[in-house]
Design a protein with these regions (language model features):
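N-terminal segment of the canonical double-stranded RNA-binding domain
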Residues: 1-14, 19, 23, 74
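Short, charged, surface-exposed hinge/linker loops at domain edges
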Residues: 2-4, 42-99, 103-111, 117-121, ...
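A short mixed-secondary-structure module that forms the rim of ligand-binding clefts
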Residues: 31, 37-38, 42-45
Length: 132
Protein backbone atom coordinates (compact mmCIF):
# COMPACT_ATOMS: atom_id res chain seq x y z
CA UNK A 1 0.00 0.00 0.00
CA UNK A 2 1.06 3.56 -0.59
CA UNK A 3 0.49 6.24 2.02
CA UNK A 4 1.24 9.94 2.49
CA UNK A 5 1.29 11.48 5.98
CA UNK A 6 2.30 14.87 7.33
CA UNK A 7 5.43 14.92 9.48
CA UNK A 8 6.50 17.61 11.91
CA UNK A 9 10.21 18.52 11.93
CA UNK A 10 11.18 20.18 15.22
CA UNK A 11 14.68 21.63 15.62
CA UNK A 12 16.67 20.29 18.54
CA UNK A 13 20.32 20.42 19.50
CA UNK A 14 22.29 18.74 16.71
CA UNK A 15 19.41 18.30 14.29
CA UNK A 16 15.71 17.55 14.19
CA UNK A 17 13.12 15.50 16.03
CA UNK A 18 10.57 14.21 13.50
CA UNK A 19 7.12 12.97 14.45
CA UNK A 20 3.91 11.91 12.77
CA UNK A 21 0.97 13.28 14.77
CA UNK A 22 -1.47 10.83 13.16
CA UNK A 23 0.60 7.72 13.92
CA UNK A 24 1.17 7.06 17.63
CA UNK A 25 4.75 6.11 18.42
CA UNK A 26 6.11 6.98 14.99
CA UNK A 27 9.09 9.30 15.31
CA UNK A 28 12.77 9.56 14.46
CA UNK A 29 15.72 11.95 14.63
CA UNK A 30 18.19 13.31 12.10
CA UNK A 31 21.11 15.71 11.85
CA UNK A 32 20.03 17.38 8.61
CA UNK A 33 16.82 17.93 6.67
CA UNK A 34 17.81 15.56 3.81
CA UNK A 35 18.71 12.86 6.33
CA UNK A 36 15.45 13.62 8.15
CA UNK A 37 13.40 13.06 5.00
CA UNK A 38 15.01 9.63 4.54
CA UNK A 39 14.71 8.72 8.21
CA UNK A 40 11.07 9.86 8.30
CA UNK A 41 10.17 7.75 5.26
CA UNK A 42 11.87 4.72 6.83
CA UNK A 43 10.15 5.21 10.21
CA UNK A 44 6.75 5.73 8.60
CA UNK A 45 7.13 2.68 6.33
CA UNK A 46 8.20 0.48 9.24
CA UNK A 47 5.34 1.62 11.47
CA UNK A 48 2.69 1.23 8.76
CA UNK A 49 4.07 -2.20 7.83
CA UNK A 50 3.79 -3.21 11.49
CA UNK A 51 0.23 -1.89 11.66
CA UNK A 52 -0.72 -3.83 8.52
CA UNK A 53 0.84 -7.03 9.89
CA UNK A 54 -1.03 -6.66 13.19
CA UNK A 55 -4.31 -5.78 11.42
CA UNK A 56 -4.41 -2.48 13.28
CA UNK A 57 -6.59 0.34 12.07
CA UNK A 58 -4.52 2.82 10.07
CA UNK A 59 -5.78 6.35 10.66
CA UNK A 60 -6.52 8.77 7.86
CA UNK A 61 -3.83 11.43 7.45
CA UNK A 62 -4.61 14.91 8.72
CA UNK A 63 -4.36 17.84 6.33
CA UNK A 64 -0.86 19.29 6.44
CA UNK A 65 -2.42 22.68 7.15
CA UNK A 66 -3.54 21.35 10.55
CA UNK A 67 0.08 21.14 11.74
CA UNK A 68 1.30 24.38 13.20
CA UNK A 69 5.01 24.95 13.02
CA UNK A 70 6.53 27.25 15.61
CA UNK A 71 10.03 27.99 16.91
CA UNK A 72 11.59 26.89 13.62
CA UNK A 73 9.55 23.71 13.25
CA UNK A 74 7.86 22.90 9.96
CA UNK A 75 5.56 20.30 8.46
CA UNK A 76 6.07 18.34 5.26
CA UNK A 77 4.47 15.35 3.58
CA UNK A 78 6.23 11.98 3.70
CA UNK A 79 5.31 9.03 1.50
CA UNK A 80 5.55 5.36 2.40
CA UNK A 81 5.15 2.28 0.21
CA UNK A 82 4.75 -0.74 2.47
CA UNK A 83 4.93 -3.23 -0.41
CA UNK A 84 8.32 -1.86 -1.50
CA UNK A 85 9.44 -1.80 2.14
CA UNK A 86 8.44 -5.46 2.57
CA UNK A 87 10.35 -6.42 -0.59
CA UNK A 88 13.50 -4.84 0.85
CA UNK A 89 13.23 -6.04 4.44
CA UNK A 90 10.97 -9.11 4.65
CA UNK A 91 13.02 -11.47 2.50
CA UNK A 92 13.09 -14.59 4.68
CA UNK A 93 12.10 -17.60 2.61
CA UNK A 94 9.06 -19.57 3.77
CA UNK A 95 8.43 -23.17 2.91
CA UNK A 96 5.29 -23.99 0.92
CA UNK A 97 4.03 -27.47 0.20
CA UNK A 98 2.28 -27.91 -3.13
CA UNK A 99 0.87 -30.72 -5.21
CA UNK A 100 1.37 -31.20 -8.94
CA UNK A 101 0.74 -34.21 -11.18
CA UNK A 102 3.58 -36.74 -11.18
CA UNK A 103 4.07 -36.44 -14.97
CA UNK A 104 4.59 -32.68 -14.60
CA UNK A 105 7.10 -33.18 -11.78
CA UNK A 106 9.01 -35.75 -13.87
CA UNK A 107 9.15 -33.44 -16.87
CA UNK A 108 10.22 -30.45 -14.76
CA UNK A 109 13.00 -32.43 -13.07
CA UNK A 110 14.24 -33.63 -16.49
CA UNK A 111 14.50 -29.99 -17.56
CA UNK A 112 16.23 -28.85 -14.33
CA UNK A 113 13.35 -26.51 -13.45
CA UNK A 114 13.80 -24.51 -10.24
CA UNK A 115 10.36 -24.87 -8.64
CA UNK A 116 10.87 -22.03 -6.15
CA UNK A 117 11.93 -19.59 -8.85
CA UNK A 118 9.03 -20.55 -11.13
CA UNK A 119 6.50 -20.20 -8.30
CA UNK A 120 7.91 -16.81 -7.21
CA UNK A 121 7.81 -15.45 -10.75
CA UNK A 122 4.29 -16.79 -11.36
CA UNK A 123 3.00 -15.31 -8.09
CA UNK A 124 4.53 -11.90 -8.83
CA UNK A 125 3.05 -11.95 -12.33
CA UNK A 126 -0.37 -13.00 -11.00
CA UNK A 127 -0.29 -10.31 -8.28
CA UNK A 128 1.02 -7.62 -10.61
CA UNK A 129 4.16 -6.87 -8.60
CA UNK A 130 7.79 -6.72 -9.65
CA UNK A 131 11.06 -7.36 -7.86
CA UNK A 132 12.38 -4.40 -5.91
Amino acid sequence: MKYIYPALFQPEEGGFFISFPDIDGCFTQASTIPEGLDMAADALSLMLWHMEEEHMEIPAPSPISSLNGNNGSFATLISADTLAYRQLHDTKAVRKNLSIPRWLDTLAVQHNINFSNILQNALMRELGVSKA
